[in-house]
């Protein structure tokens, strides 16, 4: 199992999916976020945050501070590649080295998946 919170990893993945327009990825990972302890209010907040330049900061009341940092971190990794050193210090102050690597790996891996899904125009299955 992961050392990093599954909820935080899924939040990072959902952030990547929304930022890249990978609807298939979001369709499959939003339920995983909820199953990991996330709330619909947080998903709604994430959708609002995505519309308001989350790489520069997240101000949604639905999120605790750690979740705000995770969304901002995923946004910076996705949009800028480079991450602000102060943001990294905030995360590293609360997460172990292993947790930081797991969170970063999840965000990076799903950036690759998102780009594949969007380029190939893979969309969610019909229900």
Segments predicted by a language model, with ranges:
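Hydrophobic alpha-helical segments
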Residues: 1-127
């Amino acid at each position: 199992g992961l050392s990093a919170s599954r909820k935080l990893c899924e939040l990072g993945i959902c952030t990547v999916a929304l930022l890249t327009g990978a609807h298939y990825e979001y369709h499959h990972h939003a339920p995983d976020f909820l199953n990991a302890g996330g709330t619909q209010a947080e998903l709604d907040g994430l959708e609002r945050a995505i519309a308001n330049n989350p790489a520069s900061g997240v101000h949604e009341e639905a999120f605790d501070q750690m979740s705000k940092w995770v969304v901002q971190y995923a946004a910076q990794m996705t949009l800028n590649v480079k991450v602000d050193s102060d943001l990294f210090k905030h995360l590293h102050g609360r997460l172990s080295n292993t947790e930081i690597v797991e969170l970063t790996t999840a965000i990076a891996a799903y950036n690759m998946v998102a780009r594949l899904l969007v380029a190939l125009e893979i969309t969610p299955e019909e229900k």
